[in-house]
Amino acid sequence: MRLFLLALLATLAVTQALVKEEIQAKEYLENLNKELAKRTNVETEAAWAYGSNITDENEKKKNEISAELAKFMKEVASDTTKFQWRSYQSEDLKRQFKALTKLGYAALPEDDYAELLDTLSAMESNFAKVKVCDYKDSTKCDLALDPEIEEVISKSRDHEELAYYWREFYDKAGTAVRSQFERYVELNTKAAKLNNFTSGAEAWLDEYEDDTFEQQLEDIFADIRPLYQQIHGYVRFRLRKHYGDAVVSETGPIPMHLLGNMWAQQWSEIADIVSPFPEKPLVDVSAEMEKQGYTPLKMFQMGDDFFTSMNLTKLPQDFWDKSIIEKPTDGRDLVCHASAWDFYLTDDVRIKQCTRVTQDQLFTVHHELGHIQYFLQYQHQPFVYRTGANPGFHEAVGDVLSLSVSTPKHLEKIGLLKDYVRDDEARINQLFLTALDKIVFLPFAFTMDKYRWSLFRGEVDKANWNCAFWKLRDEYSGIEPPVVRSEKDFDAPAKYHISADVEYLRYLVSFIIQFQFYKSACIKAGQYDPDNVELPLDNCDIYGSAAAGAAFHNMLSMGASKPWPDALEAFNGERIMSGKAIAEYFEPLRVWLEAENIKNNVHIGWTTSNKCVSS
């Protein structure tokens, strides 16, 4: 009995000590979160200065400050080991401590960390500074990706001109950084192992807090693949009509330079030559925006109005004062790739975008403002929770609004779409146009990370790195480069996110769940009823819906304080990511395409590409 009593007293003493420690830990975290917000703000300011004016001095400053923060994070990780946080009662404290033990690249030794920052800066800077010569004038060599090269790739229908720009860009944006990329993979792997992951792939996937996540995506993609193959077959059939058999084969992969986008990630720019009913208008309000004197400022004001119409948060004054929404004309180099920034203070949020007055850019504005709304909704949370429920949630928010903005119903409402008659043919045109962005993107997005996972996991011999990239693009997307590539080339970093070390799975996840969000928001707004043909999902406008806004608020204000299924549940009662909503949205198109492809004897699927040879 005495022994039992002593054991009980010892247990009570330990428990009391733990309760006491938990109170201290709470206070420690409160102070630490404030300090981290302050320090991250300084780092973000330096990154902003560099991204909006690429100079050696700004790069040096940015990297020095990042190194300082990394050092501090190491000290924090060391401090957290002094707490027995895994035994605490509070799930919230456990979650915060767990987040703080993930050091990422800061786990690297100082020299390696500095080298990694230099390597990433070199790749990002190379990408931002690419200039090529004019196809028709070899003395004019100042064409940048944004806007000049992208303009040609989207508008030109001369396949030789397109192939020229494709090769020039990939050679300069990709091949030029092969050695840096190899070193980046080595350092990424080293950091992952120091964080107790087997590779960088597992480190990235850990953000989704689900061991089966990779398999779930494979399964969802397998469900969507038949629709993608129908779209691919139909587009190839129409491109053959336009360019002829010598340029596009009947059964092979599609030459990617013909698809209106440098990376063939979305094909809506070639809608004019592949749209199902060419005599019916396609929704493109770019010309009307020009005619009505739209400016980048007006586009952002409209986006702000959409959020506030749903009772969500208005853009703060700091946003208008500090954002860069047009390409500066003073000749400086900057990263033009649209991005949204959180400075971890109160109401200091910004966008950097070289905005052009086009329909597509109007949607991009809403996408970026979705990030900003998320920042504003969770800014009351402790620093460690000031991020998305998972990376895909952050990307999806603005896209839900873009799906709504792009409907004929909304564009008519705001006076940009005139004399539009929505019959069955116009509807198929519109669904097809949306699919060229939303369905076509899925295999592309998957391959961006499947490729890097394979390098991080050491599954591909270095001698085959380039052809491994094209093999995946062929296998998943059925596209190929316009010219033969070899291991003398290195093409993956010609995509910004690969040069800049941005995980890409977030976009795949976003393109799936945004349809889940959209469907639920449309039902809440009384804009979609599966049993009412007058209220279809593909013409639902959630503008002005306080009910949809409240659902967004419930989810966004949680930040990362709970695992993402809890955030999804707060929005619509579901806990599982599913491809059902995206299938529902495109069902009328699937039915039409299958019949049309059979009628035209269109080949579905593609033979293996021979456009990359391992030397």
UniProtKB/Swiss-Prot annotation:
One GO BP: proteolysis
EC number(s) reported in the record: 3.4.15.1
Full protein name: Angiotensin-converting enzyme
Alphabetized InterPro entries for the sequence: Peptidase_M2
Organism, scientific name: Drosophila melanogaster (Fruit fly)
Localisation: Secreted, Extracellular space
Keyword match Secreted: yes
Inhibition and activation profile: Inhibited by captopril and, to a lesser extent, by lisinopril, trandolaprilat, fosinoprilat and enalaprilat.
Family: Belongs to the peptidase M2 family.
Any GO molecular function: peptidyl-dipeptidase activity
Glycan attachment sites: 53, 196, 311
